[in-house]
């Protein structure tokens, strides 16, 4: 006789995972989902197996707002090998060229300055970007090259931490859709020596503090020590789901207007932002219940609402 299945939970919140080296983002997601016994879970932008660092995992109703974290700014620490270019632009690929490195700090800083600010970037063939429903890396592994359009990106800050004639270490604060491996590959070509990513760590997503990250091993230890039938210690690590949209202006509504929004109706509001997405709360308790949009001054329309108000 088989073991009885353990029912999942309707648990809402966001856990900031410190992704370990060598594990795919989806593998980590499934492990976390099982640990929390969550009915629904989703991550907010994959990290390569080579990469480590912050991977927000949304549970339950928080998955409705994961796109806003996918669209958020990111901060990375990267170590690049100079003098060697690979077909994947990272250490997991095949070496395609080896060249001598002739470099001084003035020339390096001048090359780095090229990447600061607004620019356009052609995504790597070894990225998870989809083409006809399939990630580009699937085509690349079959030797197929797909034409990709350059996309606008913004590097808000790029700091040189240390360098020598074999490697360079950078910290990069950038917009969504920025491929660090492409920056490193382009940097290597600009320097004339080639380069690839040796190590990559995501330090931040949006404004989430690095101090709130937790490792998979820590979650597993907490779950192993937890009393039977309670996950309170794990749940205490969850951030509220509205933290995903904390940068949006807040609109607090009385219960009657909140009820109308839940029915899909547009409501009139005063003394609110003129336009754009807003974070919605209800009543004196300020319970979060989703996001809306002010498409015209004084008119609020529902966009993504949770199933019911959560405390």
Curated annotation (Swiss-Prot):
EC class (word): isomerase
KW Nucleotide-binding (keyword) present: no
Pfam families, per database record: TruB-C_2 (PF09157), TruB_C_2 (PF16198), TruB_N (PF01509)
Catalytic activity, as annotated: uridine(55) in tRNA = pseudouridine(55) in tRNA
InterPro entries per the UniProt record, alphabetical: PsdUridine_synth_cat_dom_sf (IPR020103), PsdUridine_synth_N (IPR002501), PUA-like_sf (IPR015947), PUA_sf (IPR036974), tRNA_psdUridine_synth_TruB (IPR014780), tRNA_sdUridine_synth_fam1_C (IPR015240), TruB_C (IPR032819)
Residues at the catalytic site: 48 (nucleophile)
Domain of life: Bacteria
GO biological process: mRNA pseudouridine synthesis; tRNA pseudouridine synthesis
Keyword terms: Isomerase, tRNA processing
EC number: 5.4.99.25
Binding site for substrate: 43, 76, 179, 200
Annotated family: Belongs to the pseudouridine synthase TruB family. Type 1 subfamily.
General function of this protein: Responsible for synthesis of pseudouridine from uracil-55 in the psi GC loop of transfer RNAs.
UniProt-recorded name of the protein: tRNA pseudouridine synthase B
